[in-house]
Structures are given as C-alpha cells and as structure tokens.
Amino acid sequence: MIQDKRDFGERILEYGTGLIKLVKPLLKTRLVFHFCLLPFALCLLTCFSGMASPINPQTTEPNEPSYLTPVEIKLSADGKKLYVLCEDGDSVMAVDTQTKQVVAKATVGHKPKGLAISPDGKTLYVSNEWSDTVTEVDAATFAVKRILKTGWGPVGLVSDRSGKTLYVANSIADSVSLIDLASGAEIKRFVTHRYPEQMLLSRDGRRVYVANILPHLGPYDQPPVSELLALDTTKQVVAERILVPGTIELRHIAEAPPALGGYLLVPLMRPKNLGPLIQVPQGWMMTHGMALIRPATTAPLGVAQSKVTQVVLDDIDYYFATNAGVAFSPDGRRAVVTSSDADIVSILDTARLAQRLREVPAEELANRLDSAVTFVVKRLPTGRNPTSVAVSPDSRWAYVTNRLDDSVTVVDLAQAKVASTIDLGGPKEITLMRRGEQMFHAAKYCFQGQFACATCHPNSHLDGLAWNLETPQLGRDRVANRTLRGIRETAPYKWNGKNPDLATQCGPRIAKYFFRSEGFNAEELGALLTYLNNIPLAPNRHIAPDGQLTEAQERGKAIFFRQSTNDGGAIPMQNRCDTCHPAETHYTARYSTDVKSATKYDTNGLFDIPQLDRVYEDAPYLHNGEALTLEEIWTVFNNQDTHGVTSDMSKEQLNDLIEFLKTL
C-alpha cells in the first residue's frame, strides 16, 4: 500500500524509468513525446505539485506598489535643479539641489527612459519607450506641452544647438528619428545597428553620437564588434560609424572639456565568450571598462578615422560590473563612472588617466587589470543599481540615480566622499519581486563581483552573443544567449533542455558554473525567481492597434499552420511549424528536438524548442546563433527541410511567414 505522496512518487519514477527504456529507440521521432512522454510528464507534475519546496516564488503578477525607479538625471544650467526621470513611476520630477526636496513632478508616457533639455533650458524632452512617444514638458511649470510620435522604443534623445531638431534613438526599431520641433513631425530616420540607447550632442554642436547596447550581427565564433554612430547635424547625414572591437553594451557618452582634447568616454563591457568559461579570476569571463574615442571631425563623411582606445576599470582581484553612467567635471579634473551592478561610483583623475594612456601601448590597455589603480581616486558606495550621473557646474557635486532604491546619491568630489542621499519618495516596502530585481542586478554574488545576471541580460533581454560554456568536452557545444522576457511557463531551460525549472537554472547551476560562489540562498533565490517569472514582454509593434492582421500576416499565418505543401503533398506532423511551436503554450512545445542544426562542434543534436513571443527582437537565432536573421533560419540552414518544410516556398511566401512570426 502506498503510504504517502513520496512513496507514490517513487513508484511513478520506477514506472517512468521503465517507460523511458521502452521508448528510447524512438526518441529520434518527435511524436513519441506527445504520445508517451508528455502524459508521463504531466503525471509527474500532478503527483509532485503538492510536495514541500524550499523556494516559493510568486508566479502570478503581484500587486506591486508604485516604485519610481529613477533611470536618468540631468542638471539645469545653473545647477539649482535636478531633473530625475522615473521609469516605473512614468514621471519626471524636479529636485531642488539646495533643499534636496522634490519640488515638481509631471506624468509622462509609459516606461520613460531618456531625458533631454532644450538649449534655452525652458523645455524638457522625455522619451517613453513603451509608448513610442516623446513628452514635451515645460521646465518652469512642469505642464505637459505636447506629445510627439517617434519610432519604436525611444530611449536616448538630444536637441541640436539651435533647438529646432530633436534626435531620438529608437531601441526596438534600430534607428534614430529626426523630429522637426516646429511642426512636431518626424522628418528623417537613420538606420543604426542594434539597440541604440544613449546619445550625446558634441560641444561644438556638429555631431550627435549614438551608442548601441548590442554588437553587430556577425559570425558566432568571432569577437563581437560594437558601434558608436556619429551623425553630422549640419548635413543631417551619417558622418562616421566608429567601431569598438571586442565589446558590447556601450552605455552613456561623455565629452571631455576642450582643455583635455574633447575626447569621448563611453562605458562598455569586454566579454570573453569565445574561450571555455572554466573560471572567473583574471577577467576570464569578462571585464568592464571604457572606450576613449578621439573623433576625427575633419575626416571625409563616411570615413572611419576616429581613434579608439580601451581601458579596464576593474581591479586585479575585484570587478565593477556593468559600467553605465559617465560624466566629466566641467573643470576637467575628474570623470565619474557608475557601475550599476556593483553599486559603486568611481572617481577618476583625468590627468593620471592620460598618463596611463601614454605609458602603456593601446593594444595592451584593453586587457590590463593593473590600470585602474593608477587613475581611480576613490570608489564610493551608492544605492542599488546606479545608472546615470550628472556633475554640477562648479565641479563640486556629482549626483547619481539609484534605480532600485528610488534615491539619488550626492557625492562631494572635492573630498571624494558621499555627502548625502536624496529620497525621491518611493514606497518603503520592498516586495518579493522588487527584492528579486535587486538580486538580478547584484554582482556581489559572483566571485570577485565580476558580473550579475543583468550583465549578460541587459534590459532583462540578451547580449547578442554565443558563449562557450564549461561542458564535458571543453570548447564544444557553444550556445547563444537567450532572452528572459516572458519566460514564465516555457520550461525546460538551457538549450539542451536539462534544467526542468528556473530554480535549477538559477540556483545550483549559476552558483557552480557561472558565479563560482555559494550563489543565492533559498530566500534570495525565491525572490529572484519571482522577478524572472514576471518580466513582461514589450508591446508588439508589428500588430495594428485594433489587433487585426495585415493581408501579408494572414497569409503568413496560413503558411505557419499549413498541413500540405504547395503541390498538395502532406507535410508530416513532426515537420509542421505548429507541432513544435503550438500557439497555446507561447509557441513552444517545451521539449527538445533535432532540426539538424548541430555542427561538428556540437556533441548533441537535440535542442530545446524556443518560445517565439517577440521573436523579432531575439537575433541571432538557432542554438548557436549562426542564423543572423529570421530569414536565414530557412534560407541558409534548412536546405534539407529538417526545420519545417520550406523548400517549396516562394520568396513571397517566406516573406509572409516572417511577417506573421513578427506578430507573435
């Protein structure tokens, strides 16, 4: 007689073991999962669902208090007001720098990410990433003046010196919109590379610089290359595409004062994704630093002649993950850089930095871990997740937004110490989900603080790389990073599908193979899983406001769900799109299959079926990132019809299929 649920579970496991032995010869066919293993899996879930678990994450969207989540900060020209942009508060506020009190607040669009001030200081421009708009706010009254349409996912923005044109970086659209401020209409659009976020107008007003978070799409077995786009504001053309090799995640941009030569400082990350990730020390997995760029403003348009030098901001035995915000003091003596996943702000001596650049060859600087000690004056603690920084006109004070603390850290640059903290008035209760987001951005859980979860998943997304993880056969089974958006109910995890749930994925696995530390305790892991289970999907820009599909999307939908080829031949069930990607389960059947995408470097051909929600944001594709676009999945890597039947399709049909996939 079965005494309790655990005894029953043991019997089920015995039955399952026998069943697997029985069907093992059939595992190469996908249908065996549906008819044999799936019922068994469901039975297991039913039997064990009531068992005690040390980790209890919330898997339903919690009723969260209205956190502010400050992400961007600017100073008025006279230094009397701080303008703070709050991502979750959907607001921009003004803070008096003397009283350190919030004195004004305006409600803007959804998920505001970027903030700019007009040349005359009378108008604030706020980009609303999920509304695809810019809110124009009167800086004196904080009244909303008008709302301007942009491209998809606006983040960074700047006005030209005349105040006539607004430049807006559209992160989802991979573009920059030029908006005529007299009419409020978009007059031009530039194509960028991947996920443009931060922007800067040069001091002379001749150029707008645009930093991209994700690297160029390229061969998965080659080092990444990121890009800083330079736009000519007079001719409104691309002036230069400045390449920054071996890097990803270009963040804020700061321009040095003329006395220092006017070089640009751009925080970045240098991933070491091509070598097996067998350790953390000595910057083995990644380092964090800056690009020093000397723009070639006199070079012919389109000719890349700017000089790029990289320098590491980490120490030999400790790292400062995810450099984000950067600013120079107006007197040029100091530069300030925030490390958002280390909760640190670093004060740099620019004279010593220049000396270091003279002493060490540029080709060495990018990987030298003994540089920062020569020019970092002080590392100061901030609140949680410092993102943006601004320096007062008198070069005395630096103001740092603490994204996950709803506060601003005030730094005394003269004495190199934290002077005070400005409370922006957010909720004091720290919910399980908020705590989980703090865990997600906490590099302290990694050995020597080298990285956090967010370091490889910027914006809770992906980094565009394929990583060479530690596997039994080192150097093989390289896998592409995957997005974390909308991952609830898409288990199992990993490309090999071996992690049955997020607790396994983010608990022992991360501690052993990534952090090389004790990792999270049960309470912390539960909070982290709550956050991961509630990462939302961004609005789908490919669907019309009324939800109706276009004619091309409807045709693509018919192709996705088709059961026969163009000549009337039946498509086997295991080779139909919706067999592996059923609509009712986020377009993933949640098991592994073989579509013959394995290369000679893979030890296994079975790979987890990815979910397709917002798949248009998830390039590169396939388990190793070989397919750079959705089209390449079939035009380059499906010549034998092993990944769905597509060889009979016309180019127009493939285009329609892609159009439908973008609606998911």
Regions found by a protein language model. Give the residues of each.
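Residue position within the beta-strands of beta-propeller blades
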Residues: 84, 126, 168, 210-211, ...
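A short beta-strand motif characteristic of beta-propeller blades
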Residues: 58-64, 101-106, 143-148, 185-190, ...
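Short loop/turn segments that connect beta-strands within beta-propeller blades
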Residues: 96-100, 138-142, 180-184, 232-236, ...
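Beta-strand-rich domains and repeat architectures in extracellular enzymes and scaffolds
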Residues: 62-90
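Periplasmic c-type cytochrome electron-transfer domains
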Residues: 240, 249-260, 265-279, 286-289, ...
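Residue-level detector of Asp-centered blade-edge/turn motifs that repeat once per structural unit
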Residues: 77-78, 119-120, 161-162, 203-204, ...
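Short, solvent-exposed loop/turn segments at conserved positions within beta-propeller repeat blades
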Residues: 87-88, 129-130, 171-172, 218-224, ...
